[in-house]
Amino acid sequence: QYYNDNTTATISAEKTKIYSIFLQDEIKLAPKHHILLGARYDYNNNHGNIFTPRIAYKWNPTENDVFRINAGTGFRIVNLFTEEHAALTGSRDVIITEDLKPETSYNINFNYLKKIRFENGTFLGFETSAWYTYFNNQIIPDYDTNPNQIIYSNLNGYAQTLGISGNIDLVTPFGLKAIVGFTIMEPKNVQNGVSSTPVLTEKYSANWAITYDIPKWFLSIDYTGNLYGPMRLPILGDLDPRPEYSPIWSLQNIQFTYKKFRSFELYGGVKNILNWTPNKGTPYLIAGAEDPFGENFDATYVYAPNQGIRGFLGIRYTIF
């Protein structure tokens, strides 16, 4: 592999040699029971031998029910300046305290999918998952030790994430379609025996996309949105007047599309219907915003879009 660009991500050109082999075998235990075995071996000229096995089991008790269990390991080499954009914002000094080791993980996932078809043509799909992931050598940005620094090091301990998620997919014969999902998780970092919550990570979230077609009016209405729970934010020490946790917040949009013409569609709508921005109720969102080149400028606290309510109009032309 060879990669170079004109950003700080590659101050010098990066060359990596990786030799890999991947094997996979599906075993049919019975008509409704399948096992998938997989293994990957890599040799990295910087990190040596890497072996990542995986196993998956699938059970179809009926044509409308599917159970899955997956377990395996992971391996990841982190590039701070392409993945951790906070390192390039604000006036905080970036401190790397050691030669960073690759992250490794162990995970298990349970999944259930249910499909229901009603006599009137309505389709209802339900999917739920539960998972657990354990990380070694995870690279965590430390905003707390020194408010003027972002300190990067491999976690001297472990990190874990335990969560559940669900999705509902509804399609009706009278023009209504809906996809609604949620995620609840419990992330935790343990450093030197001390447990903490990762910054900029919400414990629950939801999303939805609802469409209603009105053929006699040649009209389609789309309503989409996201909901986010509180997340811990990187404040500048005990004297920082900004809240340590974000509020519950939501971004919601609506769009109307007129489809009477063969190749043209007219559309318009409103983005951020609730006119929510993260600076509401906060003394100041960005530290030192009046002097973006000053020593106190810090944009790491920004956790959501800053654009308020706005409208839009457009024309869509279909060639084929």
Give the positions of each predicted feature:
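Transmembrane beta-strands of outer-membrane beta-barrel pores
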Residues: 1-4, 17, 39-45, 59, ...
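Outer-membrane beta-barrel strand-turn architecture
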Residues: 23, 27-31, 59-63, 104, ...
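Gram-negative outer-membrane beta-barrel transporters
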Residues: 28-32, 125-134, 154-235, 316-318
